[in-house]
From Swiss-Prot:
Protein name: Isocitrate dehydrogenase [NAD] subunit 1, mitochondrial
Subunit structure and binding partners: Octamer of two non-identical subunits IDH1 and IDH2.
Organism: Saccharomyces cerevisiae (strain ATCC 204508 / S288c)
PANTHER family according to UniProt: DECARBOXYLATING DEHYDROGENASES-ISOCITRATE, ISOPROPYLMALATE, TARTRATE, ISOCITRATE DEHYDROGENASE [NAD] SUBUNIT BETA, MITOCHONDRIAL
Organism phylogeny: Eukaryota, Fungi, Dikarya, Ascomycota, Saccharomycotina
Positions of the record's site feature: Critical for catalysis: K194
Length: 360
């Protein structure tokens, strides 16, 4: 009975993945491109330049929306993604002041039900870090938890914020995490929670991850850890973790720790998946407002995210070539950006990648 259940679920997952893939028109894919705020245009321009040099069969539908456009501005991006099914995206800045609007990033994910965020934290040769050989994946639920956006001021000076956790969405992210681990030969999945305090909400999350792991994925080790301890352990002994699956807020916290471990936010590739749509973006949430327009941003995270997109589209050879060129450029160390110890501009780094591609 269990094997039959797993088979049915696997077939359903495969069918969903098939629906996610966009269609080719004239042998080419159309991809929604959302540069976003901060250094978004500079790092997406880097990707466009590399793709053009490689003659990759992709056309861009560019949606220029800024954080100042408020949630109404997300409509254009949503409609474009509904047409194209796939996107490459920078980050929108979310103001922290009380008068600011809600997150456009969250609004986009919720409207399209892009429920799974994947961030890849892997050490790169040539980048000096405190701890070598990091290889960690953080998968977080994108559409509920603390990021449900449900809060109000009941009376002046008293604010209530609601954290929503549901069984269906937790089961969905659990199976996504275990399927991902299985596909990429990962040995363990760890649920991150705060069930010692939020016994119902985080208790539900922890229990469902554990239950599904034990019943449906016996070949993958499943465990759980309180988020405070997870943060400490990630800094002290990161190699003990393989795949971490988290509610929304904990994933952003651990993601920043992961970025610090491998050398900074400019190195973290990421992606977001839903039933019908996939959006690829840097895995660490840093907009770079302070260096906007200076041509010093590290485009590695965006470039590597674009290679994940190419693999998703079945353009694996292009993805492999570009990824190899990026890794060789960083390992060589002669044309790297200042965040990882170099002095090259975004443009110089991009051009060196293209030079390496031309000799492959």
């Amino acid at each position: 009975m269990l094997n039959r259940t797993i088979a049915k679920r696997t077939l359903a997952t495969a069918a969903q993945a098939e629906r996610t893939l966009p269609k080719k028109y004239g042998g080419r894919f159309t991809v929604t491109l959302i540069p976003g705020d901060g250094v978004g245009k500079e790092i997406t321009d880097s990707v466009r330049t590399i793709f053009e040099a490689e003659n990759i069969p992709i056309d861009w539908e560019t949606i220029n929306i800024k954080q100042t456009d408020h949630k109404e501005g997300v409509y254009e991006a949503v409609e474009s993604l509904k047409r194209n099914k796939i996107g490459l995206k920078g980050l929108w800045h979310t103001p922290a002041d009380q008068t600011g609007h809600g997150s456009l990033n969250v609004a986009l994910r919720k409207q399209l039900d892009i429920y799974a965020n994947v961030a890849l934290f892997k050490s790169l040769k040539g980048v000096k870090t405190r701890i070598p050989d990091i290889d960690l994946i953080v998968i977080r639920e994108n559409t509920e938890g603390e990021f449900s956006g449900l809060e109000h001021e009941s009376v002046p000076g008293v604010v209530e914020s609601l954290k929503v956790m549901t069984r269906p969405k937790t089961e969905r992210i659990a199976r996504f995490a275990f399927d991902f681990a299985k596909k990429y030969n990962r040995k363990s999945v760890t649920a991150v929670h705060k069930a010692n305090i939020m016994k119902l909400g985080d208790g539900l999350f922890r229990n469902i991850i554990t239950e599904i792991g034990q019943k449906e994925y016996p070949d993958i080790d499943v465990s759980s850890i309180i988020v405070d301890n997870a943060s400490m352990q990630a800094v002290a002994k990161p190699h003990q973790f393989d795949v971490l699956v988290t509610p929304s807020m904990y994933g952003t916290i651990l993601g920043n720790i992961g970025a610090a471990l491998i050398g900074g936010p400019g190195l973290v590739a990421g992606a977001n998946f839903g039933r019908d749509y996939a959006v690829f973006e840097p895995g660490s949430r840093h907009v770079g407002l302070d260096i906007k327009g200076q041509n010093v941003a590290n485009p590695t995270a965006m470039i590597l995210s674009s290679t994940l997109m190419l693999n998703h589209l079945g353009l694996n050879e292009y993805a492999t070539r570009i990824s190899k060129a990026v890794h060789e450029t960083i390992a060589e160390g002669k044309h790297t950006t200042r965040d990882i110890g170099g002095s090259s501009s975004t443009t110089d780094f991009t051009n060196e990648i293209i030079n390496k591609l031309s000799t492959m």
